[in-house]
């Protein structure tokens, strides 16, 4: 069995590059936030960790630095992320959405964010881009399925009682 494990090419999965580690951890933060309801503290801590890791990836990958050594793409990304979170909070307050519906909007927010990231010139030609396209579609599908199942669950509760 150990011989079979040695046949895998673990050299291709290199955890020595700091930006790859940051990308893996930021991706796990996205899935952690998207797949289950969290408390406000859990959201804030995970969003802060995700923002710091994403900023690290943008600084590491960019050769052109803006103010304070942070590339302009990184700042646009963070502003888009913070704006999306504020937009979801505003929609929740205006339309009195249930927590399940808000939870379904979070993967859609990240899907829109990754769709936007694909257009940034700093990411052209990186192998990370094909993962962003796949994660974009996966999160969009997860968000839509959560919305559909939430609507079915709400509709089913009122009929049987």
From Swiss-Prot:
One of its GO terms (cellular component) is mitochondrial membrane. It is a multi-pass membrane protein. The chain crosses the membrane at residues 13-33, 40-60, 70-90, 104-124, 129-149. It comes from the Eukaryota. It is found in: Mitochondrion membrane. Keywords: Membrane, Mitochondrion, Transmembrane, Transmembrane helix. A stretch of 270 kb of the mitochondrial genome is duplicated within the centromere of chromosome 2 resulting in the duplication of the gene. The expression of this duplicated gene (At2g07719) is not demonstrated. This is Uncharacterized mitochondrial protein AtMg00610. It comes from Arabidopsis thaliana (Mouse-ear cress). The lineage of its organism: Eukaryota, Viridiplantae, Streptophyta, Embryophyta, Tracheophyta.
